[in-house]
């Protein structure tokens, strides 16, 4: 059973009302292009939503992914915005991995997207700007563009990555993350993408970078 199959099974148990008989057009495209990752029949059981990445925001999905973290290493989020997701992730981490001494690191320019993005909603350069850097316990925020902050970060933090949440939407930003962490993403690293598939331009952004 693939990881996606397991997620789908948990979704079914978590909320039966999501089950319907039709497939959204964007999800048909996913089935056609990456059959090795997704079983076509699975999409008959999913309720149409604006985009798949909304499902990943459900608490149950965060919990499922963190349950599968086995490495002792860095916990990272790329694309913090107002801090809602990293707050949830950190609370689950503390519950499921109480012995972990690692803090969460959040990366964001806090100046909005560096370029236009056509995702679940069309956003322009500068959109998704946060008024201020969030403040929360056991979390360190790194303000700036990924191409500047990640190289400096990896000079100081050389541990392998245990968990990486990529919520930066754009191909260019995702490439910055994956290239700079290439030596620290190892077998066993859990990577959660927020916008991997499920919207019209999915195959030219996070998916393409991965």
Task: Name these PLM-found stretches.
Residues 1-71:
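Rossmann-like AdoMet
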Residues 11, 31-49, 68-210:
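S-adenosylmethionine/decaboxylated-SAM
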């Amino acid at each position: 059973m693939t990881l996606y199959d397991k997620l789908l099974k948990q979704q079914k148990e978590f909320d039966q009302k999501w089950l319907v008989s039709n497939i959204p057009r964007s999800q048909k495209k996913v089935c056609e292009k990456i059959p090795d990752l997704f079983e076509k029949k699975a999409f008959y059981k999913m309720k149409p939503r604006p985009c798949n990445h909304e499902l990943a925001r459900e608490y149950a999905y965060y919990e499922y992914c963190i349950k599968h973290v086995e490495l002792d290493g860095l916990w990272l989020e790329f694309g913090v915005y107002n801090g809602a997701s990293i707050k949830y992730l950190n609370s689950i981490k503390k519950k499921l991995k109480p012995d972990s001494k690692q803090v969460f690191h959040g990366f964001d320019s806090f100046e909005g997207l560096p370029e236009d993005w056509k995702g679940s909603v069309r956003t322009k350069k500068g959109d998704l700007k946060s008024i201020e850097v969030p403040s929360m316990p056991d979390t360190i925020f790194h303000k700036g563009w990924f191409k500047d902050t990640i190289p400096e970060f990896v000079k100081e933090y050389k541990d392998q990555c245990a968990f990486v949440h990529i919520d930066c939407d754009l191909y260019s930003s995702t490439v910055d993350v994956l290239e700079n962490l290439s030596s620290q993403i190892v077998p066993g690293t859990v990577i959660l993408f927020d916008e991997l598939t499920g919207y019209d331009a999915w195959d030219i952004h996070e998916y393409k970078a991965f």
